[in-house]
């Protein structure tokens, strides 16, 4: 509507309902000429308050926000407390138990590399293959939160949330490291943890080569 016609917007990928995004990338083909850096302001003037365009650029020929993506990074945020904190609850999930970062890290190591994540996606998912590559998982502390960063070439529906749930169950003694290894080998849903709530998950980065924002400079 901002440009007097309907434009199709293509995103880097679909996020689960309730999941946040601070680094989502989209592209659209416009029927008019407008400097790339000015597009963000033009769009923000028409968007609701809970959506904002942080920056914009003119993409290079052939760029596609979805197909050109090389890797994505998600962050899942937890806070460990016996009591609910309303200031944290919108973007993090509360865990009523002590935090065992060592156990979380040991479980995370098992996911790194190329694996079949059939046990970690929703049943009935329509995908050609459930094999995915995880480049790395790291843990970081900030302002009462424990952030789990997961970087990979692509993800299945609910995959990151179920991975985090599995890591958490291991830290709570509900699953062994062998259970997690077996879940990747055998695809057995009974060997993984629960799917964590959507509110704790944020898409923080999508990487391209070349980077369309750098190419427009």
Range-by-range predicted roles:
Residues 1-217:
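Structured-RNA-binding interfaces characteristic of tRNA pseudouridine synthases
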